[in-house]
Amino acid sequence: MRTLVRNAVAALLVFGLAGAASFAQSGEALYKSKCQMCHGEKGMADSGAGKAMKVKPVTDPEVKKMTEAQMIDAVHNGMGKMQAYKDKLSDAQIKEVVGYFRTFVK
């Protein structure tokens, strides 16, 4: 019985950690496919489209002070020239991509 419980706990830990890793990978993949064309590879808005639309980089004070909730709202409903993604991404996907984007904000 102890072996069964130990194996079950080990499986939960392994699959739980794998789930966390896939969450990060999913946010990165979504960012690359939906956001990078304007926000740039690392959020610096250094792409052609980002420069043309005058997207603010993650180093901009306005971007740096945004909370996670504000970023989620911006992706969900759009902001300035950025389109809304509420009909293109699920709430979970929006949270994942914002989580990934926030890794650039220092």
Which role does the model predict for each range below?
Residues M1-A24, A74, Y100-K106:
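Post-cleavage N-terminal segment of exported redox proteins
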Residues R2, E28-L30, D91, V98:
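General helical secondary-structure elements
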Residues L4, M44, G48, T67-Q70:
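N-proximal short alpha-helices
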Residues A11-V14, A45, V58, A84:
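A general structural-boundary detector
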Residues F15-L30, D46, P61-K64:
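Electrostatic cytochrome c docking/interface patches
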Residues A21, K32-C35, L89:
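A composition/secondary-structure signal for short, hydrophobic, low-basic-content segments
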Residues E28-K54, M79-K81, T103-K106:
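Periplasmic/extracellular electron-transfer cofactor-ligation site
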Residues A52-V105:
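Extracytoplasmic electron-transfer domains, predominantly the class I c-type cytochrome c fold
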